[in-house]
Swiss-Prot record:
GO cellular component terms, semicolon-separated: cytosol
UniProt-recorded name of the protein: UPF0434 protein Nham_0083
InterPro entries according to UniProt: Trm112-like
Family label: Belongs to the UPF0434 family.
Disulfide bonds listed in the record: none
Length: 65
């Protein structure tokens, strides 16, 4: 039996995170588990993760400081 924290949508696979890059800068991304976002510091964008799927569209990203 799985607990809510064991669900795959609560995290991002490390291998996937190694492969994914920011579509704007082609730079690395950081996983923010609390907000369920992938952060591009160079583009100052936060890409949402919905139901365990990273949404890598710049128009869907949140601008960050």
């Amino acid at each position: 039996m799985t607990t809510p924290s064991d669900r795959p949508e609560d995290t991002v696979d490390r291998k996937l995170l190694e492969i994914l890059v920011c579509p704007v800068t082609k730079g690395p991304l950081e996983f923010d588990g609390a907000r369920q976002e992938l952060i591009s510091r160079s583009a100052k964008l936060a890409y949402p993760i919905r139901e365990g799927i990273p949404i890598m569209l710049p128009e869907e990203a949140r601008k960050i400081e």
